[in-house]
Amino acid sequence: DLILAEDTRTSSVLLRHYDIDNELRSHHKFNEHQTAQSVIKRLQSGETVALISDAGTPGISDPGFLLVRECVRNGIEVQTLPGATAFVPALVSSGLPCDKFCFEGFLPQKKGRQTRLQTLQDESRTIIFYESPHRLLKTLQQFSEVFGEKRQVSVCREISKIHEESVRGTLAEVVEHFTQTEPRGEIVIVLAGTDNGEKPVKEKNVSKNKYKKDNIE
């Protein structure tokens, strides 16, 4: 009955491709507190509501948690479809241990950022972050200061897209790479934990996706 989208302009392209013309409304981080209760009322009246993201999976560094929590509190069934999540392929292709890991998502932009990093200094599991391209270099430089420039890291961008690319090496090497090469696209940083921080994955390398992915115009 209702489709909630992070950005209706983006989602409408996909929906039009499949001739889906159900009611479409925006549901994002700036309005989810206001819209959650009205959505709950529609669900309680017997309607069916779908929540989709621009990319990735709702709730994973995307809107969705608040609405799901309200559904659970109100005894409303939530069905989740397996979807794309950037950090999983980034982790698998990093060459770093993926049997144990922690997902940190986006770091605070200002307040609490340094404190958050300091709490992770002794983390032995592989650590995964999301970052925007214009903050990537500064973030990697901060990582070098906090974790040491010899710590192994893999930076993946544009996962599942035509220009998919992974840059692997020590923090010092990857900082040097992105000092010379402007980062673009959506970024996933996979950082080695303390147990394997000094063990090289490989010499610094850049791998690119050989296969073009399906595009919907």
Segments predicted by a language model, with ranges:
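Short hydrophobic/aromatic-enriched beta-strand-loop microsegments
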Residues: 21-29, 78-79, 99-105, 150-156
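Class I SAM-dependent methyltransferase SAM-binding "motif I" and its flanking Rossmann-like core
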Residues: 66-123
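Short, well-ordered secondary-structure micro-motifs
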Residues: 37, 62, 90-92, 114-118, ...
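Short, acidic/turn-prone active-site loops that include or flank metal/cofactor-
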Residues: 8-9, 26-33, 84, 104-109, ...
